[in-house]
C-alpha cells in the first residue's frame, strides 16, 4: 500500500451542487471563516482548493441567496487579537498626532516671536535722521551726513549673511534652542551697545553693523529650519510665509513706536495736528494754559540748520537725547520676547517627527515593492510628461557645475542690479525729502498756500477765539519738523507721518511677495521679473523729481517700489527652481546670496561717491538704469544654459 492517501475522486464534486449537501444554515460547531479568505486580494480569483476549509468557503459562495441571508452577522464573530492590537495602535497614533500638532504650534509661535524681533534690524532707515542729528550735535561738527549711514547698513547686511552661515553650522553641533538663544542674546547685547555708542559713528557701526547684525544672522535660519522640519510638505509654504509676515509686522509696529517714544506726549500729539486746526483746538482749554503750552513747545523746537550740501538735519536736543534710551528699551523688550520664543521653540531632533517621517518612507518603499508594475507605470507617465529641460534640471549639480553654468551668472547679475535699489530705498526713504532736490521739486509743484486754508478755518471760528495773542500756528508747525520745511505742500508732514508711512511700506513689501508669487504662477516667473523691473525703473527715475512734489506722490511712488521689491524675494527662488530644478534650489540660491552681499558693498561705495561729487538725481537715475539692464538680461536665458559644460548634451 502507498504511504500517501489517495487523492479525492472527481465524483466527490458533482457537476451541479445538490441542495442536501449544503444545508441552509451553518452548523454551530463549524468555525467561522473570514470572507477575506474567499478571494485572493492580489489576483481577484478563487484560491487553490488544496485546503478543505478554503474549498468549502469557495463553494459556499456559489450557494443560493437564502443560505447567504441565513448566515450570522459579522458582529457575532469574536474579535481577533490582531484587530484589538490595531485598535490600540490607532489610539496611540492619534495621541502622537495630537502631541505633534501641539509641538508644531509651539514651534511656529516661538519662531514668529523670534522673527518679529529680528525684523527690528530693518528699522535703521527710520532712525537714520535721529542718529545723524545726534552725532552732529555731540561732535559739534558738520562732517557727518546721511550718506555715512550707507556703511552702517552695508556692514549690517554683510554680517547678517556671515552670521547665517555660522548659525547653520552651530545648529548641527549645539542644537536648535541653544543656537537660537545665543543669537538672540548676541543681538540684545548689540542693541544695548548701540545705546552707548550713539555719540560716535565708528563705534555705532561696530555695535549695530557688526555685533547686532551677527546676532540676527545666527538666530535667523534656526527657527525657520525647525518649523519646516516639523511641518508636512503641504504646509511648508504658508509656514515660511507666516514667519516672513512676522518680520514685516515688526517694521509696521516699531516705526511708529520709535517716533512715539522719541517725541513723547504731548509733543507727539501736537505735531500730528494740522496747522489750521491748532487755533480751534487750543481754544478749547483756557487761553493762558494753551498759550503757555504752545510757547514752550515753540521754544524747545528749533528750525534745523542746513548743511553746506543743502541737507537739513534734526537739531531738537530734547528729542535727540532720547535716542540712547530708545535702544535700551528695544533691547529690554526684545530680550523678553526672544526668551519666550526660545522657550516655545522645539528641537526637531528630539521629537518623533523624524521617526514618523522614516516610517512613512518605509511604508512608501513597501508599497513600491508590493506593486512594482504600478510604480513603473507611474514613473513612465511622469517621464513622458516632462520636457527635456525639466529632466536635465532635475540633475544634482555640484558647486563647480553651478559656477560653470551661464544661467547662474545671469541670475547673479540680475540680483546684483536689483538689490542695489532695494538697499538704497530701505535706508534713504525717510531722508530723501530732506535733500535740496526735494525743495526744488516741491517749489515747482506750487500748491495752494497754507494761508487760504487757514483763513477758511479761522472764518468759521468766533472772533473772540481768534485773538492775536496766540502764537502763529503756521510758524509753530513749520518749526516742528524738518520735513515741513521741504515746501508748502509738505507743511503738514512730520516725523510721525513719515514713521507711519514706513510701517505701511513694510506691510506692502510683505504683500508684494504674495502678489508676485501669484502673478508668477499665472504668467511665468521669468515674465514676472520683466514686469517687476519695468514698473520699478520709472518710479526710481521720478523719485528725485515728480515724486517729491507732495507727500501724496512720494508715498505712492514708494509704495509701488516696495511692492515691486517684494517680488525680488519671491520671484528669484522660483526662477532658480525653473532653471536648475527643485533639487538644486538650495545650493544655487546659497551661492546667489553672494550677489546680495556684493550688491550692498558696491552700492555703499558708488552711492557715497555720487552723493559727494554729484547729486540725488545721479543716484536714482543709475538705479533705474540697473533695472533696465536687468530686463535686458532676461532675454539671454535659454533652458539648456543651466547645464554645466561637463554634460555632453550641452556641448555644441
Swiss-Prot record:
Subcellular location: Plastid, Apicoplast; Membrane
Transmembrane segments: 46-66, 126-146, 167-187, 189-209, 212-232, 278-298, 345-365, 385-405, 417-437, 445-465, 467-487, 515-535
Topology within the bilayer: Multi-pass membrane protein
Organism, as annotated: Toxoplasma gondii
SUPFAM superfamilies the UniProt entry points to: MFS general substrate transporter
GO cellular component, one term: apicoplast membrane
Chain positions covered by the region annotation Disordered: 1-53
Keywords tagged on the record: Apicoplast, Membrane, Plastid, Pyruvate, Transmembrane, Transmembrane helix, Transport
Family: Belongs to the major facilitator superfamily.
Name of this chain's protein: Apicoplast pyruvate carrier 2
Assembly notes: Interacts with apicoplast pyruvate carrier 1.
Function: Along with apicoplast pyruvate carrier 1, forms apicoplast pyruvate carrier (APC) complex, which transports pyruvate into the apicoplast and may also transport amino acids like methionine, serine, glycine and tryptophan with low efficiency. Required for maintaining pyruvate-dependent metabolic activities in the apicoplast, such as synthesis of fatty acids, isopentenyl pyrophosphate (IPP), dimethylallyl pyrophosphate (DMAPP) and methylerythritol 4-phosphate (MEP). Required for maintaining the integrity of the apicoplast. Required for normal parasite growth.
InterPro entries: MFS_Riboflavin_Transporter, MFS_trans_sf
Residues in the Cytoplasmic compartment per record: 1-45, 536-652
A single GO BP: amino acid transmembrane transport
Amino acid at each position: 500500500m502507498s504511504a500517501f492517501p489517495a487523492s479525492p475522486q472527481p465524483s466527490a464534486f458533482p457537476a451541479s451542487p445538490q441542495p442536501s449537501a449544503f444545508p441552509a444554515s451553518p452548523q454551530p460547531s463549524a468555525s467561522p471563516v473570514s470572507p477575506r479568505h474567499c478571494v485572493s486580494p492580489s489576483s481577484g480569483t478563487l484560491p487553490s482548493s488544496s485546503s478543505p476549509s478554503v474549498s468549502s468557503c469557495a463553494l459556499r459562495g456559489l450557494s443560493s441567496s437564502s443560505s447567504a441571508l441565513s448566515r450570522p452577522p459579522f458582529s457575532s464573530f469574536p474579535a481577533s487579537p490582531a484587530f484589538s492590537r490595531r485598535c490600540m495602535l490607532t489610539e496611540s497614533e492619534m495621541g502622537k498626532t495630537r502631541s505633534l500638532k501641539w509641538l508644531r504650534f509651539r514651534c511656529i509661535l516661538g519662531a514668529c516671536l523670534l522673527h518679529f524681533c529680528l525684523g527690528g534690524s530693518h528699522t535703521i532707515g527710520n532712525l537714520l535722521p535721529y542718529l545723524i542729528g545726534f552725532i552732529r550735535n555731540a561732535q559739534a561738527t558738520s562732517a557727518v551726513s546721511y550718506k555715512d549711514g550707507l556703511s552702517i547698513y552695508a556692514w549690517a547686511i554683510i554680517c547678517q549673511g556671515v552670521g547665517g552661515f555660522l548659525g547653520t553650522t552651530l545648529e548641527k553641533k549645539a542644537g536648535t534652542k541653544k543656537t537660537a538663544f545665543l543669537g538672540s542674546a548676541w543681538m540684545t547685547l548689540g542693541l544695548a551697545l548701540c545705546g552707548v555708542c550713539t555719540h560716535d559713528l565708528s563705534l555705532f557701526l561696530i555695535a549695530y553693523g557688526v555685533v547686532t547684525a551677527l546676532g540676527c544672522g545666527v538666530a535667523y535660519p534656526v527657527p525657520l529650519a525647525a518649523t519646516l522640519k516639523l511641518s508636512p510638505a503641504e504646509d511648508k509654504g504658508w509656514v515660511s510665509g507666516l514667519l516672513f509676515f512676522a518680520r514685516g509686522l515688526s517694521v509696521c509696529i516699531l516705526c511708529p513706536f520709535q517716533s512715539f517714544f522719541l517725541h513723547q506726549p504731548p509733543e507727539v500729539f501736537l505735531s500730528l495736528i494740522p496747522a489750521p486746526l491748532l487755533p480751534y483746538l487750543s481754544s478749547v482749554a483756557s487761553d493762558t494754559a494753551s498759550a503757555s503750552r504752545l510757547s514752550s513747545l515753540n521754544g524747545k523746537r528749533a528750525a534745523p540748520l542746513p548743511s553746506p550740501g543743502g541737507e537739513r538735519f534734526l537739531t531738537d536736543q530734547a528729542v535727540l537725547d532720547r535716542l540712547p534710551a530708545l535702544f535700551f528699551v528695544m533691547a529690554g523688550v526684545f530680550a523678553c520676547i526672544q526668551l519666550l520664543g526660545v522657550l516655545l521653540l522645539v528641537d526637531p531632533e528630539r521629537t518623533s517627527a523624524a521617526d514618523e517621517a522614516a516610517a512613512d518612507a518605509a511604508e512608501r518603499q513597501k508599497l513600491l515593492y508590493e506593486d512594482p508594475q504600478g510604480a513603473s507605470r507611474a514613473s513612465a507617465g511622469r517621464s513622458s510628461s516632462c520636457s527635456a529641460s525639466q529632466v536635465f534640471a532635475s540633475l544634482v549639480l555640484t558647486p563647480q557645475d553651478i559656477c560653470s553654468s551661464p544661467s547662474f551668472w545671469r541670475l547673479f547679475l540680475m540680483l546684483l542690479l536689483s538689490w542695489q535699489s532695494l538697499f538704497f530705498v530701505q535706508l534713504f526713504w525717510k531722508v530723501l525729502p530732506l535733500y535740496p532736490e526735494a525743495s526744488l521739486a516741491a517749489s515747482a509743484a506750487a500748491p495752494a498756500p497754507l494761508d487760504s486754508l487757514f483763513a477758511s478755518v479761522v472764518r468759521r471760528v468766533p472772533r473772540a477765539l481768534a485773538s492775536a495773542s496766540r502764537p502763529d500756528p503756521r510758524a509753530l508747525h513749520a518749526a516742528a519738523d524738518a520735513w515741513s520745511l521741504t515746501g508748502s505742500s509738505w507743511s503738514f508732514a512730520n516725523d510721525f507721518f513719515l514713521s507711519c508711512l514706513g510701517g505701511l511700506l513694510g506691510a506692502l513689501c510683505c504683500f508684494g511677495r504674495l502678489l508676485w508669487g501669484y502673478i508668477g504662477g499665472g504668467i511665468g516667473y521669468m515674465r514676472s521679473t520683466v514686469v517687476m523691473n519695468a514698473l520699478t525703473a520709472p518710479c526710481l527715475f521720478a523719485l528725485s523729481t515728480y515724486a517729491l512734489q507732495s507727500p501724496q506722490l512720494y508715498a505712492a511712488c514708494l509704495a509701488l517700489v516696495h511692492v515691486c521689491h517684494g517680488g525680488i524675494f519671491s520671484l528669484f527662488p522660483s526662477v532658480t527652481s525653473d532653471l536648475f530644478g527643485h533639487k538644486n534650489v538650495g545650493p544655487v540660491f546659497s551661492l546667489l546670496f553672494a550677489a546680495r552681499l556684493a550688491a550692498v558693498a558696491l552700492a555703499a561705495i558708488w552711492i557715497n561717491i555720487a552723493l559727494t561729487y554729484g547729486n540725488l538725481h545721479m543716484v536714482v537715475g543709475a538705479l533705474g538704469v540697473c533695472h533696465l539692464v536687468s530686463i535686458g538680461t532676461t532675454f539671454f536665458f535659454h533652458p539648456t544654459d543651466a547645464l554645466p559644460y561637463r554634460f555632453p548634451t550641452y556641448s555644441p
